[in-house]
């Protein structure tokens, strides 16, 4: 008891000492002007040019200042926006991620349907909120294993050829609870059909199926330089996928502009955004010619942007996309 009392007194004394320490402030220091700061920096550079040493030119040709001041915000209007405002710069809903939390989608790139299924269930158990599966090149091109190039089978992800494969992939995965996230390549018709049949067999409601089973034919064309069929046929299938989703699976996205091919091909952020917007407009106009209005198209559409190591530029890219 005596030891406990002594220990308690020591703790109280330490807490009192912490309370007695005054808060650290910088009131004793005068705030330097920009000119004073620059003068100090020039002295430290020891003859090196200030503009060359302190300003950074990005891959996009944008010059970044060494520090930013309130004067740099003059004339800007988008910095006064909030979530839910008309620009959508900081999100379409005022409550942001509280309204809809960020989706956690750890990609599963196992080679067989059974292995991919185990990986998906493991990731969902760890906290993922989406069943995110990577398909191999053969499946993305629409080839079965018996006709595909051997090098493209199970090269970067799972190979799917039959309804049985899709059944194994989604076995014991609650698609009413978790999102599904699969990029199907140039066409998603075959995969959408298989998933719809699996849901029917498992007595799962397609109305509750949410997430994305998407196609990006122009992206695949940019990646390989060719498609297995005319581009207009893929546009027809894209229109069919939107009409089907609108009627049967209204919470499922079916069209994507995937910028991986441009980002990994060396495009800077400005070029990546330009290609993405051009591609999105092309899809939109193609769907309009097939009787799908703009609002319906964009309801079933999403962007997929690659994110590199330059945090400043990547955040700027995502913000400018929202503005556009």
Regions found by a protein language model. Give the residues of each.
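Helix-rich catalytic cores of soluble enzyme domains
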Residues: 177-324
């Amino acid at each position: 008891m005596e030891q406990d009392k002594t220990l308690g007194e020591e703790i109280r004394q330490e807490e009192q000492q912490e309370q007695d320490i005054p808060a650290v402030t910088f009131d004793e220091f005068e705030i330097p002007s920009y000119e004073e700061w620059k003068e100090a920096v020039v002295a430290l550079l020891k003859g090196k040019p200030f503009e060359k040493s302190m300003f950074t030119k990005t891959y996009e040709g944008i010059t970044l200042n060494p520090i930013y001041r309130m004067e740099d915000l003059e004339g800007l209007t988008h910095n006064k926006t909030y979530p839910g405002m008309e620009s959508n710069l900081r999100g379409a809903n005022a409550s942001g991620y509280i309204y809809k939390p960020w989706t956690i989608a750890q990609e599963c790139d196992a080679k067989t349907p059974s292995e991919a299924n185990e990986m998906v269930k493991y990731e969902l158990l760890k906290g993922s909120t989406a069943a995110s599966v990577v398909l191999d090149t053969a499946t993305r091109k629409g080839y079965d294993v018996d006709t595909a190039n051997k090098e493209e089978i199970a090269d970067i992800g799972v190979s799917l050829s039959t309804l049985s494969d899709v059944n194994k992939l989604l076995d014991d995965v609650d698609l009413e609870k978790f999102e599904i996230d699969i990029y199907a390549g140039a066409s998603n018709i075959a995969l959408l059909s298989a998933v719809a049949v699996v849901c029917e067999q498992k007595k799962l409601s397609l109305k509750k199926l949410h997430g994305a089973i998407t196609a990006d034919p122009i992206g695949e064309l940019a990646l390989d330089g060719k498609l297995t069929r005319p581009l207009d046929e893929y546009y027809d299938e894209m229109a069919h996928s939107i009409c089907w989703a609108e009627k049967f699976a209204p919470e499922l996205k079916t069209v994507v502009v995937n910028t991986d091919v441009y980002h990994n091909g060396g495009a800077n952020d400005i070029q990546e955004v330009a290609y993405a917007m051009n591609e999105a407009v092309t899809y939109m106009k193609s769907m309009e010619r097939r009787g799908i209005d703009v609002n319906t198209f964009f309801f079933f559409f999403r962007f997929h942007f690659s994110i590199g190591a330059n945090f400043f530029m990547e955040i700027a890219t995502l913000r400018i996309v929202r503005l556009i």
